[in-house]
Structures are given as structure tokens and as C-alpha cells.
Amino acid sequence: MTDIFARRATLARSVRLLSQFRYERSEPARFYGALAADTAAMVDDLWRAGHGESAAGRTLLDVGGGPGYFAAAFADAGVRYLGVEPDPGEMHAAGPVVAADTGTFVRASGMALPFADDSVDICLSSNVAEHVPRPWQLGAEMLRVTRPGGLAVLSYTVWLGPFGGHEMGLTHYLGGSRAAARYARKHGHPAKNNYGSSLFEVSVADGLAWAACTGAELAAFPRYHPRWAWWLTSVPVLREFLVSNLVLVLQPQ
């Protein structure tokens, strides 16, 4: 399932993606545009590996799609895009940067998707599971709406990884509550990704255990790592600190 994508998972790609993180706040279009393009290519690689053809023409549901950067990337790839986002502020954050006709957007929760069973070819969630209190309920909803033989791709930021604290930086290693309080004292307001309300601890071990119990797991790998470092996913404890983002690929039967 990962053979095609693995050829693209090079050190150069990892460096290129990680170099964009510094623009997340100052130039969001640059950061999210690069991440969206890479994600669309990754999803197409995974689809090709399982189906022998491009994902163009397929219907994709993006759970937590945000303001539309991902919609634009998938539209460029010829994929029919449906985006779900619970926060109206996020839905309009890109303003006129992203064309309105790149997809269809629905305001709803990823933990209660307003779509019928087996209704989409691909269901994607990118960096959302760590922002909901019940990430595996979100995962179950993704599997529910994905057609048998389709793909559910769930990617999330690992709590103990270097990016787990989001804008709180590495202070999350002091504990989530302490890091959140420290951020609020320093900046005079809570973090956007506030521990306990909009940011939660999600581990590699929990994700792997959930995927295994679904009976639908096809692959699990670190999203931003080169192929030669994917072995980290299989090492308990170490993976929690060095796998910054885990991708779970599942196929309902």
C-alpha cells in the first residue's frame, strides 16, 4: 500500500516540508499550501497503490478541512472535494486567497459526520485528531462514511513529539496544564490550541491499537519522515518522541 508513496518519502521532501513550518503564522498560505499539495500527492500515491489508477474523479471527504487550502490542492488533482469544519472562523480564514468553487463545505463535527454510510471513496483527516476529545470516535465516523474498498487516511500530531505542544512550543514536556498556564501568562490570553479544550494528548500507541482493533488497517507510518526512518513507528516509547506525526491508512471491507 505504501510502495509508491515510499519512493517520494525522501530526506529532501522531509527537509522541504519542515522548512515550511516557520511560515505557519506569518504566511499561512505558503505553509498550508505546501502541506496541502504534499497531502494530495500522498493520498493519490496511496490510492494508486491499492487501485492501480489515479484518485482523479473520486470523491474525498476532508474532516477538519479548514479554510480551503486542501480543497484547492485536491481540485488541482481532479478530486471531488467535500470539506467538513466545525469552526466558521476557520472556514473563512483564507479569505479570497482560495477560490470558492474548489469544493463543497459543510459546517459539522468530525465526531458526528452528517453523511450516509459508505458515501465517499476517500475520507481524510489531517492534523485534527489531537484537537478533539474523542479521536477514535472521529476515526470510527471516517470508516463509517467510507465505501468498502475505499481509503480512510487519518493523520495526527503526536503529543510527545516535538510539535505536540503546537504554539506552546516544547513547554508541553512540562505537562499540558502547566504549559497552557505558562502560555496564557506570557501572552495575556490562552493559546488557540489550548490544552484540555482544543488540544489533547494522542499517542502513537493509542493510534496503532485503535487501527488494529478496527480490522481495516493497511499501513501506519510517520508522515514527515524519510522512508528509511519509518522503522521508528515500531519501537515503543521511542516512537512517542520521534514520530512527530502518525499516518494511519485503513480500508473498510
Swiss-Prot record:
One of its GO terms (molecular function) is S-adenosylmethionine-dependent methyltransferase activity. It is an enzyme of class 2 (transferase). One of its GO terms (biological process) is methylation. Its EC number is 2.1.1.-. Pfam families: Methyltransf_11. It comes from the Bacteria. Keywords: Methyltransferase, Transferase. InterPro entries: Methyltransf_11, SAM-dependent_MTases_sf. PANTHER family: 2-METHOXY-6-POLYPRENYL-1,4-BENZOQUINOL METHYLASE, MITOCHONDRIAL, METHYLTRANSFERASE. Belongs to the methyltransferase superfamily. This is Uncharacterized methyltransferase MAV_4945. It comes from Mycobacterium avium (strain 104).
